[in-house]
Regions:
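A glycine-rich beta-strand to alpha-helix segment
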Residues: 82, 111-112
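Mixed-charge interfacial surface used for oligomerization/domain docking
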Residues: 2-3, 11-29, 33-34, 87-90, ...
Length: 277
């Protein structure tokens, strides 16, 4: 294929992509007094610590249309990925930017993918996009193959804290406080509509790990790729990697620290797990 670029907002947790022209478009996390831009300069650990002490509201802000247009550049075909449109305006902004860029240069092709997810599931989609772009000369076939693949990717998450979700109104403050006091971990998934869907609650790391592994199999996991992002919880990420590889020796499993936006939602101790079915 001719010149191409892969673009994603920073919910993908990637800053670079080996062997590809890749651009990350930062979201930001804001409180009434501070703003954290989710780019290469962000100290994620410092942000997490600050937000834990924040008593007022906090929220995320998506890239604007101009940010997306700048990331798309002036030439070449583009595949772009956004955090789920159910949680952010990033997808809508990217679609307007696509329209503007294609009007300026009708020969260009830009495909904007609403991930209906975040973090590790987007990472899987980006990896697949790179594979398809290298394998096909036809842009439409790449987009079609990517759409087919997306139907077989999933995201699970385990939250040790729901402080930030309470501060931005996504869960009640009472529920977040009770979960913290009782040591309860909330387990959920990205639904087919791209919303946060709670699946259950567990007390203790072992039960949370077993719950996630059971859900993976229930959703059709048979040994495909797994990407695990963690917020200050490398130990649980490693335990998950080890157990998955013990059960599925051929599985391609990798773990890594989450960047800013996903750390904002996952919080300290949180895990986000993307996988293929």
């Amino acid at each position: 294929m001719n010149q191409f670029r892969i673009v994603a907002d920073s919910s993908c947790d990637l800053l670079t992509l080996d062997g590809a022209d890749f651009v990350s478009v930062p979201l930001s996390i804001r409180t009434d007094t501070e703003e954290f831009c989710d780019d290469a300069n962000l100290d994620v650990d410092a942000m997490v610590s600050t937000l834990r002490e924040t008593k007022g509201r906090s929220y995320s802000a998506c890239p604007n249309i101009a940010d997306w247009e700048s990331a798309f550049g002036e030439s070449g075909n583009v595949i772009a990925f956004t955090i789920t449109s159910a949680l952010s305006g990033s997808y809508n902004a990217a679609c307007v930017a696509k329209k503007n860029c294609e009007e300026r240069n009708p020969a260009r092709r830009i495909c904007v993918v609403d991930s209906l997810s975040a973090g590790p599931e987007i990472a899987l989609l980006i990896e697949r996009a790179l594979y398809e772009l290298r394998s096909h000369a036809d842009f439409d076939k790449v987009c079609e193959a990517l759409n087919t693949y997306q139907a077989h990717t999933h995201l699970l998450f385990a939250l040790e804290s729901m402080h930030n979700l309470a501060q931005n109104g996504r869960v009640s403050k009472l529920a977040a406080t009770m979960a913290s006091v009782l040591g309860i971990r909330a387990i959920g998934q990205a639904s087919a509509e791209g919303t946060l869907e709670m699946l259950g609650k567990c007390r203790g790391v072992r039960k949370a790990r077993q719950f996630m592994l059971s859900e993976m199999v229930e959703l059709g996991y048979k040994g495909g790729k797994v990407r695990i992002g963690h917020c200050q919880n490398a130990a649980l990420a490693l335990e998950l990697c080890t157990e998955i590889q013990q059960r599925f020796p051929e599985a391609d499993v990798r773990s890594y620290p989450l960047r800013g936006l996903c750390s904002y939602y996952a919080e300290r101790g949180g895990i986000m797990l993307g996988f293929e079915s």
